[in-house]
Regions:
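Short, charged N-terminal helix-start/capping segments
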Residues: 2-14, 80-86, 97, 108-114, ...
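NAD(P)H dinucleotide-binding glycine-rich loop of Rossmann-like/cofactor-binding domains
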Residues: 95-149
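Short N-terminal strand-loop motif that marks the start
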Residues: 1-67, 133-137
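A near-ubiquitous, low-amplitude feature marking generic local secondary-structure context
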Residues: 5, 19, 53, 81-84, ...
Length: 149
């Protein structure tokens, strides 16, 4: 089942943020659902919502500096369990099958890679970022945050 989550989105270039509801995809075998606790603001978020780096599809929920707690895991997830603290950067998926992906160079994925926002997921839906309460990412695009931090 898809997950509905509140999010902040911009609906037009140079517009203000508005609260919307996002539908996050169903968990695939290698996905994790993250309850977002923190999302940083990067200048790239500002450039994007102002359309200074090219056209975007509105509404858009930016945010690619994400920290949170794993809330659910897909059946094939091996790196994380519910309750783990994780971070997410600017990518959330790649094909995982091309030579670049197999050699840990997902940013050069031949399919191409899926960025955290303003990118198409492989299911054809537009990726939306971390200015929301939850996000679904492929487990290999999360990184563990040590309890000591």
């Amino acid at each position: 089942m898809t997950t509905s989550t509140p999010a902040l989105a911009v609906t037009q270039a140079n517009g203000s943020f508005e609260t919307i509801s996002l539908e996050r995809r169903d968990l695939r075998d290698d996905d994790i659902l993250i309850d977002i606790k923190f999302a940083g603001i990067c200048h790239s978020d500002i450039h994007t919502v102002r359309q200074e780096w090219g056209d975007i599809t509105f509404p858009i929920t930016p945010g690619h500096e994400i920290a949170g707690i794993v809330a659910a895991v897909g059946d094939g997830v091996t790196k994380y369990k519910v309750g783990d603290r994780v971070g997410v950067g600017c990518m959330v998926d790649s094909c995982g099958e091309c030579e670049n992906c197999k050699n840990d160079h997902e940013q050069f994925c031949t399919k191409p890679a899926v960025f955290t926002y303003n990118s198409l997921n492989y299911d054809g839906e537009r990726a939306q970022g971390g200015y929301s309460q939850q996000i679904v990412v492929t487990e290999r695009f999360a990184c563990r945050i040590p309890d000591s931090l």
